[in-house]
Each structure stands twice: as structure tokens, then as C-alpha cells.
Amino acid sequence: MDKKPCNSHDVEVRKGPWTMEEDLILINFISNHGEGVWNTIARSAGLKRTGKSCRLRWLNYLRPDVRRGNITPEEQLLIMELHAKWGNRWSKIAKHLPGRTDNEIKNYWNRTRIQKHIKQAEASFIGHINPEHSNEQASTSLLSSSCHADHAVESYSSSFNGNMGNNVQYPNHFPTESNDYFWSMEDLWSMQLPNNGG
């Protein structure tokens, strides 16, 4: 069953990426009339977008005071400090970082937390394979350079090839196409020890 407009004021709503033309219409409308009720702005500006879509586009991308570029080290420290204090209250945190949006801060936090967990897992994995490295280098990624990666594979191969009575082939290098030398699941599976149970 197709949805039909309830009255003559309902218009087909456009979804998907914003065009440069739509951005310019919204910027010009707000510069001439100011911010206000976003549903009214969307309709009055002639945009076939929802008020929410217009508000988010303006606040997160088009506002003149939105900062561009990477989060600075000072901002990183402030985000960590404020997150420890207020948790995931991104809007409250954003008020202390002029020009940064709550969404940008949330995305930054989630992205860096995931990277931190991956690096901890790598260090733990390497420490399990070669225990002498676990105490000295557990807090840093052993895979941050190809030198470390090659050493890790040599240690891995020599640890198991010498102690196993079979001729298992292990990779002599890690793939260098992946970002920051993260292992793919295929790489990890290919390094699994054969099942001794048969």
C-alpha cells in the first residue's frame, strides 16, 4: 500500500547525500533569516528535506564555526578528562570544545577505543606466543613496523616449529597491505596450530 500525502502541504521528502545546491540554499536561508523552527526552515527554504535533516546538516557541517581537521592532542586530553567525569554525554562534552560537534567527538571516542582494544589484543597475542615480550612491550603494539612484525613471526615460527614433530608451514611475513599492520581473520586462522587430536 502506497503512502499518500495527508494534505496539499506534504511533499516528497528527499533522502540520501546532500548536494552542493542544497547546502547553498540552507546556508543562504539561515544567513538571511537565522535559525528557528527547523521544519519551517526546511519548508520555507524550498528544501525537500525534513527539519531534522536540515538541523543536523547545519550543526554538523555547514555552521561557520565548525572546526575542520583532526582532533588535537590538547582536545584528546580534554575529551578523556570530560568523559571520565560525565561519561557518554557528548553534547555536554562538546560545549567545552569550541567548534567540535557532539557527533564528531562521539565518533572520535568510539574509533580510538576500538583501535586501543585491537592494539591490546595484538600485544596480548604476541605476549602469549613469545612470553619474553609480554612484560617489556605489552603496552605498545609490536606490529607497528615491519621489523617488529618479521621478528614476531620468526619468534612464533621458531617457538612452534622446533617443538613440534611435524612440518607445519608458517608465514614468513605479515601482509603489508593492511593498515597499521593489523591482522585479518584470514591471517590469524592461517597461523592456527593443527589439531593434534586427528
Curated annotation (Swiss-Prot):
Matches recorded under PANTHER family: MYB TRANSCRIPTION FACTOR-RELATED-RELATED (PTHR45675), TRANSCRIPTION FACTOR MYB24 (PTHR45675:SF44)
Residue ranges of domain HTH myb-type in the record: 10-62, 63-117
CDD domains, sorted: SANT (cd00167)
Gene3D superfamilies, A to Z: Homeodomain-like
Recorded name of the encoding gene: MYB340
Keywords tagged on the record: DNA-binding, Nucleus, Repeat, Transcription, Transcription regulation
Tissue: Expressed only in flowers.
Source organism of the structure: Antirrhinum majus (Garden snapdragon)
Name this protein carries in UniProt: Myb-related protein 340
Functional note: Transcription factor.
Keyword Repeat: yes
GO cellular component, one term: nucleus
Regions recorded as binding DNA: 38-62, 90-113
Keyword Acyltransferase: no
SMART domains (alphabetical): SANT (SM00717)
Subcellular location field: Nucleus
Any one GO molecular-function label of the UniProt entry: sequence-specific DNA binding
